[in-house]
Amino acid sequence: MVLLLLVAIPLLVHSSRGPAHYEMLGRCRMVCDPHGPRGPGPDGAPASVPPFPPGAKGEVGRRGKAGLRGPPGPPGPRGPPGEPGRPGPPGPPGPGPGGVAPAAGYVPRIAFYAGLRRPHEGYEVLRFDDVVTNVGNAYEAASGKFTCPMPGVYFFAYHVLMRGGDGTSMWADLMKNGQVRASAIAQDADQNYDYASNSVILHLDVGDEVFIKLDGGKVHGGNTNKYSTFSGFIIYPD
């Protein structure tokens, strides 16, 4: 009986319909379906396999190389004109009709004197804005700075009135290009006002700046009374 079953099973499989094929594995046969578990579609074409679900998002790739440099853009619009520069120093007098320059040579005229209108405090440049004298136009009231127009030896002096009454002190420094060249201090000492004064003689080159900087405390302005003043003039040129 067993022998009959072993012979009948391969014959039944071989006679089944469809394009399926089988393969002998020893004494048994394995049936294979080329269309997968779903079989062919209605028109005989293989049925599509359902897509797999998307996997996890990958890491960000490395940054690519920089592209080529683009061409320069068009020029921008023309900017507004700048402010006019400071006037230059006066030139030496020319020879008059039939005359010559004095034997002593040219004597420059550079001098200024200005007072302080409004009070200041803290750490700032004192802008002496009440200008009385400015021969040569080397002092600028808006910035409080004297700019040397001619190399030579100059004299400067300053007198600053402290606004006290609260037990504090006041320091005022004369600066040349940001470096202290003279200092003065006024202390309260139970008084409402006290003066800090000093003077210097400096050699300056063209473009050097001289100004007074408050280094703590309060300064009385004085409106037009000129309690606090700054002055200077050239002694002789190089």
Swiss-Prot record:
In Pfam terms, one family for this protein is C1q
InterPro entries named in the record: C1q_dom (IPR001073), Cerebellin_Synaptic_Org (IPR050822), Tumour_necrosis_fac-like_dom (IPR008983)
User: Where's it mainly located?
Assistant: secreted
Q: What is this protein called?
A: Complement C1q-like protein 4
Cellular localisation: Secreted
User: Could you tell me the keywords of this UniProt record?
Assistant: Collagen, Secreted, Signal
Q: Which gene encodes it?
A: C1QL4
One term under GO cellular component: extracellular space
Annotated C1q domain ranges read 105-238
**Subunit description:** Forms homooligomers, predominantly dimers or trimers. Forms heterooligomers with C1QL1, C1QL2 and C1QL3, when proteins are coexpressed; this interaction does not occur after secretion. Interacts with ADGRB3.
